[in-house]
Amino acid sequence: GKGLSGGKLIVVPPKDSTIKPEDNIIIGNVALYGATSGEVYINGVAGERFAVRNSGAHAVVEGIGDHGLEYMTGGMVIVVGKTGRNFAAGMSGGIAYVYDPDNTFYEHVNKELVEYKNVKSRYDEDQLKEMIQKHYQYTNSNVAKKILDDFGNEVAHFKKVVPHDYKRM
């Protein structure tokens, strides 16, 4: 996934695996580094520095390590699990949505260049639902199924992360 420039990347554990994907790192550090386009669906957790310098890829992942989305300039990332510390440091473009049912995301986000708020617009809800449906379709994710089964209520647990400069547009 490093330097992804189109196509679709789907990462799932082996069929005979007994791990719980949403609790295990399944893709290593710096995945999606410098990605410019394409779609990524990861049934599991990514390591550190996920989607650093992403400028156009769209991804759904079930958790990420520290420094995720650092220096991101475009694209969209949906995290349906925990984030590590220093999330979105230097992020100047793109959009992230983070599933935060326990309201602890604020402890991990670097607020220097971004702000986060609850998802309120129909556009955001539709975009989230469409990507999570694809994630479920491609990965059979238990997390995606749980969210989709009660989407009307679960959407309230998402935070939208945008650079301050986006808000000025």
Regions found by a protein language model. Name each.
Residues 1-169:
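Long, distal/terminal scaffolding or interaction modules
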